[in-house]
Amino acid sequence: MAELDIGQHCQVQHCRQRDFLPFVCDGCSGIFCLEHRSKDSHGCSEVNVVKERPKTDEHKSYSCSFKGCTDVELVAVICPYCEKNFCLRHRHQSDHDCEKLEVAKPRMAATQKLVRDIVDAKTGGAASKGRKGAKSSGTAAKVALMKLKMHADGDKSLPQTERTYFQVYLPKGSKEKSKAMFFCLRWSIGKVVDFAASLANLRNENNKLTAKKLRLCHVPSGEALPLDHTLERWITKEECPLYNGGNVILEYLNDEEQFLKNVDSYLE
């Protein structure tokens, strides 16, 4: 009787056994019997080849350059002054002790002079009138402060002595016109902006170079406060200070915009 052509011969030279259910090696693609189906048993030519597989879940991360900080971000957050990478918590100059912080001071001095000129123009330039206006603003802020303390949102873990309260007027087009908030006196303006944005659920793309920046603006001058200054610095200023219990404005501005226009329209 003729032999049926069923199955295949094992490719191991000293074996050549016909197997009706042969195994195909996924390494060398050879045909083998049950005894020689493992790579070791048939001396597979591919057994020592290491195939690199792409890691589909691997993401590039960026470590913070601030000493002692172990935070990482999925996007690069580079300080435009010292050009080092930081986490969102340390991205502002004052928060990472930027080595280039002094460079901005001459420009800020000129900006402060411009603010004084604007305020003087609005008040007629009279010193006595200016002092009277400042006293009036301070008194109004003290009255407002008592009301703000009753319903302001903020970090409840902050000591009472470090809390500073504001009526924060939100960007045009927001669902709410304003929101009472309190912040730590020692925070940088940049951190105040980030915290206020989270409380009011505002879009905050301050870490993107091309996007409009969310800025905290002085009332009544409309000056966009430098992100690296501290809140305490503006509370203790002799000229054009921020008042605990006073008003501030949040708005999206381009990098070249240093002042907010139509300040009164936010307060109406």
From Swiss-Prot:
The modification N-acetylalanine is found at residue 2. Zn(2+) 1 binds at residues 10, 15, 33, 36. InterPro entries: AN1-like_Znf, Znf_AN1. Pfam families: UBL_ZFAND1, zf-AN1. GO terms for cellular component: cytoplasmic stress granule. GO terms for molecular function: proteasome binding; zinc ion binding. Zn(2+) 3 binds at residues 64, 69, 87, 90. It is found in: Cytoplasm, Stress granule. The ubiquitin-like region is necessary for its localization to stress granules (SGs) in a VCP-independent manner. The AN1-type 1 and 2 zinc finger domains are necessary for the recruitment of the 26S proteasome to SGs. Both the AN1-type 1 and 2 zinc finger domains and the ubiquitin-like region are necessary for efficient SGs clearance upon specific arsenite-induced responses. PANTHER family: AN1-TYPE ZINC FINGER PROTEIN 1 (PTHR14677:SF37), ARSENITE INDUCUBLE RNA ASSOCIATED PROTEIN AIP-1-RELATED (PTHR14677). Associates with the 26S proteasome; this association occurs upon exposure to arsenite and is reduced in the presence of ATP. Interacts (via AN1-type 1 and 2 zinc fingers) with PSMD1; this interaction is increased upon arsenite treatment and occurs in an ATP-independent manner. Interacts with PSMC4. Interacts with PSMA1. Interacts (via its ubiquitin-like region) with VCP; this interaction occurs in an arsenite-dependent manner and is necessary for the recruitment of the ubiquitin-selective ATPase VCP to stress granules (SGs). This is AN1-type zinc finger protein 1. It comes from Mus musculus (Mouse). The gene is Zfand1.
